[in-house]
A protein has these predicted regions:
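Short, Lys/Arg-rich N-terminal segment immediately upstream of the first membrane anchor
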Residues: 1-5
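Periplasmic c-type cytochrome electron-transfer domains
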Residues: 6-10, 16-494
C-alpha cells in the first residue's frame, strides 16, 4: 500500500511539473494585435514558433557573439540581422520578416512571409533606403542566414550558456528564474535544434549557392517535411513580390497560376503551403488561420510604389522619359508583350511551355510529381484540403506590376536589367553583380556593376553555373535600336 501511495504521489508530482513546464515554456500565447496591415505582414505570426522560433534573447545576441560568421565577417557594417539584407526601421524592435510571439512566458522570434517578400530601393547613392512592403526580396540572403545559424550552433567554444548569457547581460538583467531557464533549457535546446538543421541542410553544399535575392524554395520542403530523398535538382530562383494577387484569382472558371512554374493555382492555398514550408503544423493552424486569411487578403490588394520614371518632370532628371518615347513604347508593348503580361491578355498567368520560352529549366525540374502528391497529402492525420497543386511544363507569364523594382530579370535573376533583357541571349552579360538597391536610371532595374554601390553587399552572378542560364525569353530582341529604346522607356514606368 505504501508503494502505491508513493507511486501515486510521484505521478501527481510529475503531472504538475510537466504541466508547469508546458505553461512556462510551450503554451502558445496570443500575439498582441497588430492593427496596421503593413506592419502585420512584416511582423505577424504564421504559427511556426514551436518549430522555428528562437528564444528572444538568444536571437538578440547571436549576431554580436558570432559577428565573424556574418556574411562579411567582422568587417560587416552592422553586427545585427541587417547583415542578411533585411530592412530594419529605426526604433522598431524587430527587422522586417521576423515575428515575436510567446510560448509560455518566453518570447520567441520566428521568420514569417516577409523575410523573403520585402524590398528596398534608393534613387541615388546618398539617399536613404525606402522599404517596399511585400516586395521582391532583392537584398535578402536566406542561405547566408541559414548557414550563419548552423555555424553558430557548431561553435562549441561560444554557443554555450556562459558566453550567451554574458552577451545578454550587456542589454538586460534577466530575473533569476528566466536566467535559469535560458541556462539549463533554452540555450542547450536551441543549440540542439540548430544542429539538427545542420544535418537537414547538408544537401545545400553539393549544389550552387542561391546568392542574394534568390532562394531554392521547395527543395528544403521536399527533403525536409515531405521526407523525399535528396536529388540533383536545383531550384534557385528569385523571390517573387506579392503584389496585386487578386489578378491571380480564377477567371471565367479558369484557374490562373501562382509561383514561377505555376505549381499552385490558388492564392489561399499558396499562403497556407508557404506557412507549412516555414514550420507551421496542424497543431498551430487553428490559432493561425485568421492570420493567414489576413495575409491572403493583404497580398491580393497591396501595390508597389509608383515608378519614378515619368514624362512630366524636369527633363534634366535621370528619371525623365519623353512622352514620344512613352507613346511609341506603349504601342510596342501592346504588340509584343501584352498578350502574356496584361490581365486581359490571352496568356496572362498561364504556363508558357518550356520549349517556347526557352529559359533555364532547373527550377521547373525541381518540382516533381512525387513532391506534388506528397504536399497534397501532407500530414495524414490532418486534412488540409489542398486541391490545386500542379506539375507543369513551363513558366508562368506573370504581371509586370512594379517591374522597376524586380531586377534582375527572368525567374532565376540571370539578366541584370531591362535593357539587356531586350538583347539576344548570346549578347546578354555572362557576369554581373546583384545586391544593390540603387535604381539603374539608364538601363532599368538596379545597378549591376562590381563597384556601382559601396554601401550594399554585392554577389557575383555567373550565368555559366547550373541554374543560372540567361537563355530564352526572346520577345522584343528583334526590334530595331530605336524601338528598343522606346520600349525600354515604357517598361521603366511599369
Amino acid at each position: 500500500m505504501i508503494f502505491w501511495r508513493l507511486h501515486l504521489g510521484f505521478l501527481i508530482t510529475a503531472l504538475f511539473v510537466g504541466l508547469g513546464a508546458w505553461l512556462l515554456l510551450f503554451k502558445a500565447a496570443a500575439q498582441p494585435h497588430i492593427k496596421d496591415d503593413d506592419s502585420f505582414f512584416n511582423h505577424g505570426s504564421i504559427g511556426n514558433e514551436a518549430t522555428q522560433g528562437i528564444p528572444y534573447w538568444i536571437w538578440r545576441v547571436l549576431p554580436e557573439v558570432f559577428s565573424d560568421y556574418l556574411p562579411q565577417g567582422p568587417d560587416s557594417t552592422a553586427h545585427d540581422w541587417t547583415a542578411f539584407g533585411v530592412y530594419w526601421d529605426k526604433g522598431s524592435e524587430l527587422p522586417v520578416g521576423f515575428s515575436k510571439k510567446s510560448l509560455g512566458k518566453i518570447p520567441r522570434v520566428s521568420p514569417n512571409c516577409a523575410i523573403c517578400h520585402q524590398g528596398s530601393y534608393r534613387l541615388s547613392e546618398n539617399s536613404e533606403p525606402q522599404l517596399v512592403n511585400s516586395g521582391a526580396g532583392t537584398q535578402i540572403d536566406i542561405q547566408a542566414f541559414t548557414r550563419f545559424l548552423i555555424r553558430a550552433a557548431e561553435d562549441e567554444d561560444r554557443f554555450n550558456a556562459d558566453v550567451i548569457l554574458a552577451a545578454v547581460e550587456k542589454h538586460t538583467e534577466l530575473p533569476a528564474w528566466e536566467k535559469a531557464i535560458y541556462r539549463y533549457a533554452l540555450i542547450p535546446g536551441t543549440k540542439s535544434a540548430l544542429l539538427k538543421q545542420a544535418e537537414a541542410f547538408k544537401w545545400m553544399d553539393s549544389k550552387p549557392d542561391w546568392g542574394i535575392g534568390r532562394i531554392d524554395p521547395f527543395n528544403p520542403v521536399k527533403f525536409g517535411i515531405l521526407e523525399i530523398e535528396p536529388d540533383n535538382t536545383i531550384g534557385n530562383s528569385d523571390m517573387m513580390p506579392l503584389w496585386q494577387l487578386h489578378l491571380a484569382e480564377p477567371e471565367d472558371g479558369n484557374r490562373l497560376s501562382v509561383h514561377w512554374d505555376g505549381l499552385l493555382t490558388d492564392v489561399r492555398e499558396t499562403v497556407i503551403a508557404g506557412a507549412i514550408g516555414d514550420g507551421m503544423t496542424y497543431k498551430s493552424f487553428a490559432l493561425t488561420e485568421e492570420n493567414l486569411d489576413r495575409i491572403d487578403s493583404y497580398i491580393k490588394q497591396i501595390s508597389p510604389p509608383p515608378s519614378p520614371f515619368r514624362h512630366d518632370i524636369d527633363e534634366a532628371s535621370p528619371f525623365f522619359v519623353s512622352a514620344s518615347d512613352l507613346g511609341a513604347g506603349e504601342q510596342l508593348y501592346v504588340q509584343n508583350c501584352s498578350s502574356c503580361h496584361e490581365p486581359k491578355g490571352q496568356r496572362f498567368r498561364r504556363v508558357i511551355p518550356i520549349e517556347e520560352i526557352g529559359t533555364d529549366k532547373h527550377r521547373l525540374d525541381m518540382w516533381t510529381f512525387e513532391a506534388m502528391n506528397k504536399y497534397k497529402n501532407y500530414q495524414a492525420e490532418y486534412d488540409w484540403g489542398f486541391e490545386h497543386f500542379e506539375k507543369t511544363n513551363g513558366y508562368v507569364a506573370v504581371d509586370l506590376t512594379g517591374l522597376w523594382l524586380r531586377g534582375p530579370y527572368l525567374h532565376n535573376g540571370s539578366v541584370p536589367n531591362l535593357r539587356t533583357l531586350l538583347m539576344r541571349p548570346v549578347d546578354r552579360p555572362t557576369i554581373f553583380y546583384r545586391g544593390s538597391d540603387i535604381v539603374d536610371t539608364e538601363n532599368g532595374g538596379f545597378l549591376s556593376g562590381a563597384s556601382d554601390d559601396a554601401k550594399s553587399r554585392i554577389w557575383r552572378v555567373d550565368t555559366s553555373i547550373a541554374g543560372n542560364s540567361n537563355s530564352g525569353h526572346i520577345w522584343g530582341t528583334d526590334l530595331s535600336p530605336d524601338e528598343k529604346e522606346a520600349l525600354l522607356a515604357y517598361l521603366k514606368t511599369k
